[in-house]
Amino acid sequence: MNKFLSMLVLLICTNLATMFAQNTTLEVDNQYPGWLSNKIPFKDQASVQNLTVTGYINGTDVKFIRELMNNRQLSHLDLSDANIVAGGEAYYINTYDHSYTIDEDNTIGGYMFCGKLKYLSLPKSITKIETDRYTNFFCNPIDTLIIGGDLKELRLVDVYQAEKYLEIREGVSSFIGYPSGYGIQARNVHLPSTIKELETETFNTDTVKVNVENIDYFGNRCISKYYYETGVLDIDTLTFSQDLSIWNVNAFYLKNGTTIFLNHCCPKKKSWT
């Protein structure tokens, strides 16, 4: 009897521990926009740090995600296979009582993911980013940002605060570089094969690991430390596209001893760094 009671008590304790355990990693499929908060138990809302969402989210869901980012523990957000749809509540109201809402499907708006994130992977289905000239959608510096898919153009101001790793998915074909001084600052960058040109001030850093094998054109100061400053790239090897035709003066400065592989191409000597 004592053995039976001991086993019963152990079973009850185990079930209680499981019942009240808080999850730090969650994957949620949200098929009904506006219902994301109902898909996550309250106890997990306080503890989740790593959240993956698929399905459909609207303004109400983004408002809830912002709450998890700013007032709870969420720091890793993966929306790669989610779809942002119009509707729902305003996800943010600023100090001037201006409401930020989602009015169009597959669109990222200003301050949408403003919070304490370290990792953000945006939906592949995004086709438009609508932010102010000097603001972006995540506000604060972030370690890792993954962006692109159906998006064709990317403003540099929308990615310049990614500090450690920036991955731009296949499909993005061009950068929009205004305003000056907002180039990419990430130390490790993956460019898609669909980007063929680096325009003026694409990168705002002096140390970067980036694949440039598919780049056919390097613009003036496309990699420089900061606007009028010139930085020395702290890399050992550069391998260029076989289709490289123009290498502009002051595209970037290399440290002494850097090895350059031109893949048997013969660049037109418009100008050399």
What is the predicted role of each segment?
Residues K39-D44, I65-N70, G109-F113, T135-F137, ...:
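Leucine-rich repeat
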Residues L5, S47, N58-E67:
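Accessory end-domains appended to solenoid repeat scaffolds used in host defense
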Residues Y111, T131-T135, L156-V157, G177-P179, ...:
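Recurring C-terminal helix/loop segment of individual leucine-rich repeat
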Residues M1-T24:
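Bacterial Sec-dependent N-terminal signal peptides
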Residues G34-T52:
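N-terminal targeting signals for Sec/Tat export/insertion, comprising classic cleavable signal peptides
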Residues V62-N70, E89-C114:
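Extracellular beta-strand-rich solenoid/capping regions of secreted or surface-exposed proteins
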Residues F20-I40:
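Boundary/junction segments of secreted and surface-exposed precursor proteins
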Residues N23-N30, Q49-I57, L74-G88, Y96-D103, ...:
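Structural signature of tandem-repeat unit edges
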